[in-house]
Amino acid sequence: MLKKIFYFPIKIFVKSNILKKEKLTERFNEIYKKNYWGDFQSVSGPGSSLKNSKNIRIALKKIIKEYKISSITDAPCGDCNWIKNIFKNNKIKYLGVDIVAELIEKNKIEYKSKKNFNFKFLDLTKNKIPSADLIICRDLLFHLSFKDGKKFLRNLFQSKYKYLLMTSHSNGIHNNFNNVKDIESGDFRKINIFKKPYNFNKNYELLIKDFCDGKEKYMILFKSK
């Protein structure tokens, strides 16, 4: 009972201090160090647990085979907990990028035996995203303000890719809500990528249920124009 009484005030206090930091690198570094999103399996949050990533892991294996994917950029990669064991084929080149430099260095050590794995520090709101057959942007946009989200999308669309996997809390038909709530980057709110300010085309290749703890969320596969 004491944990329940004190946990939420502490959590709110920590978040308030994190979001006051001016630079995104500082905010996300603090989130990582304090394990603010973490659960028992992953510092990247509950969406990266094996339980909550089951559907996307199954789907990603099929996507790699069906769409003949030979290279992947995972932006952001976090600690790679959900994706680390998908690539049995070492011919698939995997690049994980993230804004937390300490986590990138840790990943380089953790996955050094995987010769097809590489990692790079990037602020996705400032840097062009490395090109690949498939770019995965899982659980990112809903942590970015509208302003930073637009910066990220500008960089994303400057990259070359054949396919893009993107998170949305709406499939464009069911629960087709408008994006009205803005946040400070590092916080969270639900997003619908088919509505302003994102305006993704509803003509997508594949819809994958990527529910987190039973809450509606999707990964949506788009083909490059």
PLM regions with names:
Residues 2-130, 144-225:
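Class I (Rossmann-like) S-adenosyl-L-methionine-dependent methyltransferase catalytic domain
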Residues 136:
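A conserved beta-strand element that flanks and buttresses the S-adenosyl-L-methionine
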